[in-house]
Structures are given as C-alpha cells and as structure tokens.
Amino acid sequence: MGSVRTNRYSIVSSEEDGMKLATMAVANGFGNGKSKVHTRQQCRSRFVKKDGHCNVQFINVGEKGQRYLADIFTTCVDIRWRWMLVIFCLAFVLSWLFFGCVFWLIALLHGDLDASKEGKACVSEVNSFTAAFLFSIETQTTIGYGFRCVTDECPIAVFMVVFQSIVGCIIDAFIIGAVMAKMAKPKKRNETLVFSHNAVIAMRDGKLCLMWRVGNLRKSHLVEAHVRAQLLKSRITSEGEYIPLDQIDINVGFDSGIDRIFLVSPITIVHEIDEDSPLYDLSKQDIDNADFEIVVILEGMVEATAMTTQCRSSYLANEILWGHRYEPVLFEEKHYYKVDYSRFHKTYEVPNTPLCSARDLAEKKYILSNANSFCYENEVALTSKEEDDSENGVPESTSTDTPPDIDLHNQASVPLEPRPLRRESEI
C-alpha cells in the first residue's frame, strides 16, 4: 500500500493536558514508553461531529472584523439567512436615505423648499425631505411615477441621478449574486449522503481491514466521488514535544485509484491494516483502551450544479466494532436491484475474527481456524438447510464417536460451497 503522510503540526493546544500526557508511557505510537497501558483515559471532545461540523471555536483573532469585511462576498455567502436578509434590506434602505438626503440638500441650497420662491427648481415637486426620499426611491428602482423629475437647472442634480443609478445597479448585482451563490451552495446535498454509525474491523481476503459504509439517498449521482480518511491522536515526539492532534493519513486506495467510487448503492470503504497503517500494532484490547478519532471524508461534484461538495463524519475508538461485518443491503430482484436502507447501520458479529494486532497476525502468532470460518450468507444457507431437513424428517445422528475413515484435518480444509444471496426473502 502507499506511504503514510504525517502532518507535523499542532491544531489545538492545551498546556495542562500536554504536561499530564508528557509523563505517560503509552504503547503503539501513543507515547514514548514501552509498557502498555490499558487503563482508558477520559475521552477527548470529538473534533469532527457526526453531522460533519468541526467542533472548533476561534478566539483572540486579531482584526477579525476588518478581515471579514475585506472578504465581504464570502462573508455574505457564509452567514445565516436571517443576517443575509438584514444586509439585503439595509443595503437598499441606507442607499435610499443617503441619496434622499443629497437631493434634499440640493433643494435646500437652491431654495426650492421655499414655497414663495418663483423660478425653476432643481428637482420638481421636491419641497420636503419626504419628497426627496420618495424621489430617491423612484430613481434607484426606476419606478418613474412621472410626478417628480430632475431638471436641467442644476447640473449637480443631474450628476447625482446618474451616480445613484450606477450605485443601484452595483448593489443589485452584489446582493443578487450573493443570494444566488448562497442558494447554490452544495452544503444541503450532504443531508442525503450518509455514513454508517459505526466502523468495523474484520477479516477480508485474509487480512484485517478497517471498514465503514457510505450511502447516497438520492438517485442523482455524485460525480468524481472519492473518499479519504485521517486518524487524529495526540503524541509526543522524540524531542518531548506534545502534539495534541496529530493527523495521519489512512490509505483507502489512493495509489491504486480505488478511492474513487461509483456511489449508486451503499459502498463499504476498506482500509487494509498493513505495515503502513497507523492501526498495524493495535489489537482489540488496544482499540478498546485507545483514545483517537478517525475522520472520514467523502468528496464529489453535485450532478445538477457541478459544484464540489464535501461530507464528513468521524469515528471514535469506542465506535469501532471489532469482529463485525455489515449486513447486506443490496438485493437482486427480477429486473432491478433493491437497496434496503433499514439494514444500512446494522452489523453482525464474526466470532472467528482474531483478536490480535495485524502485526501479530502477519507474523503468524495467531492461527486462524478454517473450520469455523463461516461467512454470513453461508450461515444463512446452513440454517435454511437444517430447517428443510427437519421438516422432511431426516434423522439426526446421535453418535458422538468419530468414524475412523474421516480425516478431520482434510475435512477442515474443504471450503464451504458459496451460496449467492439473490433474494431478500432468503434472509
């Protein structure tokens, strides 16, 4: 498999936790000590929540307001809708008030507010602030009632009409663009992309594998969908530096290209626990007492808008089920395939799963019994056969002696005949 890239930087800092963990000796990459510590510590807060939101708060950010205003468009796209509507209304009302004040000042300086004055006014029928405000609204929104209008008496009034028209177009373009960008954000697409509640570790093709399941609830496809994962845990460097959240890549097939998936029906993502895996030295007992978090990410382009979306979730160590597999969800009907999402999060236990680490398994410290290696579908098949035999009256053997002509070693090596699962009614 590919190499593991480790990011050598800290994301969160906690001096108190750092001093406390610096004195601890934890095995399997969780510390510098050599002795194993199986007393579970208090679990840290989840870095990425189940719904994909990052559990992070930024404090003591210098010049935060100025930085957000410098990128005002992104700020408007990211803020909540209620604040977006407030900005939308304020932008128009303030511009109307500003230009209404300008037209009122022009009328005041020209003497148009004096009813006894004779002569041509700069803006006809503008003899109060209310009239100037209404004229500003009519100019910017191009309503044009025809009752008030600018004349050629004052060039400054003509210039302000032109200037307000340009400003109004800029405000319209900015606000409408921000609203459309906010509506087109693929964030809500994540509501129809789901991860399984638990990850599992089980044997697959003779190797221990970490697996989790992803599904797409919509019929529209996710274009160029691909997955990646990272393991977050604290560690202490050889120099004694405490890193509270060290990020380690988990290989899900990036080098071979199998990280790209065709997400039409639910798919199980597989991470082979090999010598490059951060889980290579962890046994079931180590997993049960470990304190780490696996962040899983699904990325792809929304078919309708071609915009990239990212769906995230995470699994803590206590959310990884050792010796379990996922129940099947895809069933073949007569002319189509059916996906049963009621089984999406369900798992079943595989009793013969080795409890040792992948390293111990590779070094053949654990002998896997072939005689007890039943897959879920074969268990179902055997159960159905026993029920049929009991209904047909086939007598069961009561002898406990082993016949002399049967070789138990050869019998254990004979694999079970696979039985494909083709109908939901069979299970």
From Swiss-Prot:
Region feature (Polyphosphoinositide (PIP2)-binding): 181-208
Keywords, ordered alphabetically: Atrial fibrillation, Cell membrane, Disease variant, Disulfide bond, Ion channel, Ion transport, Long QT syndrome, Membrane, Potassium, Potassium transport, S-nitrosylation, Short QT syndrome, Transmembrane, Transmembrane helix, Transport, Voltage-gated channel
Intramembrane segments: 129-140, 141-147
Residue stretches spanning the membrane: 82-106, 157-178
Positions where S-nitrosocysteine occurs in the chain: C76
GO biological processes: cardiac muscle cell action potential involved in contraction; cellular response to mechanical stimulus; intracellular potassium ion homeostasis; magnesium ion transport; membrane depolarization during cardiac muscle cell action potential; membrane repolarization during action potential; membrane repolarization during cardiac muscle cell action potential; positive regulation of potassium ion transmembrane transport
Disulphide-bridged cysteine pairs: C122-C154
Binding site for K(+): D255
Gene3D superfamilies recorded: 1.10.287.70, G protein-activated inward rectifier potassium channel 1
Extracellular face of the membrane: 107-128, 148-156
Subcellular location: Cell membrane; Cell membrane, Sarcolemma, T-tubule
Membrane topology: Multi-pass membrane protein
Regulation: Channel opening is promoted by binding phosphatidylinositol-4,5-bisphosphate (PIP2).
Expressed in which tissues: Heart, brain, placenta, lung, skeletal muscle, and kidney. Diffusely distributed throughout the brain.
Major subcellular site: membrane
Residues in compartment: Cytoplasmic: 1-81, 179-427
Self-association and partners: Homotetramer. Homomultimeric and heteromultimeric association with KCNJ4/Kir2.3. Can form heteromeric channels with Kir2.6/KCNJ18. Associates, via its PDZ-recognition domain, with a complex containing LIN7A, LIN7B, LIN7C, DLG1, CASK and APBA1.
Disease field: Long QT syndrome 7: A heart disorder characterized by a prolonged QT interval on the ECG and polymorphic ventricular arrhythmias. They cause syncope and sudden death in response to exercise or emotional stress, and can present with a sentinel event of sudden cardiac death in infancy. Long QT syndrome type 7 manifests itself as a clinical triad consisting of potassium-sensitive periodic paralysis, ventricular ectopy and dysmorphic features. Short QT syndrome 3: A form of short QT syndrome, a heart disorder characterized by idiopathic persistently and uniformly short QT interval on ECG in the absence of structural heart disease in affected individuals. It can cause syncope and sudden death. SQT3 has a unique ECG phenotype characterized by asymmetrical T waves.
Family of this protein: Belongs to the inward rectifier-type potassium channel (TC 1.A.2.1) family. KCNJ2 subfamily.
Protein's recorded name: Inward rectifier potassium channel 2
Species per Swiss-Prot/TrEMBL record: Homo sapiens (Human)
